[in-house]
Amino acid sequence: KDYFVGNTPHGGYLTAVMQKALSLSMPHPHVINSNTLYLDRTEPKEISIHVDKIRESRGSSVGRVSLIQDEKLRCMMTGICSDFNYMNGVNDLETLPPKIFNEKRDSFISLNFDNKQEGFTPSFIKQTKCDIAKQHAWWLKNENDLGDEARCAGFISMGEEIPDQFVLSFYSDFFPPVVMNKYGPLGWVPTLSLTTNIRQVPTCLLYTSDAAD
């Protein structure tokens, strides 16, 4: 239960588990695109995972993953796999780092809700070191401070190791719902679907920025 929200597995964690199953079943090791549908609640007990290969070519393969519990389909994923070790061509990912990299780290605060209510921080957050911008820390605000943009940005890591593709998938559903920075606590906001696109594996500290239009 280290990767749970209460008694429910975290959405990014489930995506990472399904991606792992897909990558082990396909001829290409890296899941460069995945689309996950969370169809029903997954309980904290045994599951089964079934993988179907839909298409295979020299440079990519496509598969479908079904997560089943109590003979009921709980989550479904389609994914495209390739191999970063053989992907060549134009690279447009070299962009200037955002201004936030130049800000002092004391302008960030640990992602921890326990000062609002003891035990309020989900267990999956405690597996990481995450510091977010203070202006996005909705749990420290009062009603007069609300109304900011629906956004959350910060730095995140799990130990000293560089995250692999599965950790990236876990991170993709990591931050609290950004609408809370605008409207305050809204209770449980479930993830109904999650799309990840991984273009290359990271080589350094990760900065993450989530926003809602």
Q: Regions from the language model: what does each represent?
A:
Residues 8-9, 17, 33, 42-113, ...:
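HotDog/MaoC-like acyl-thioester-processing domains
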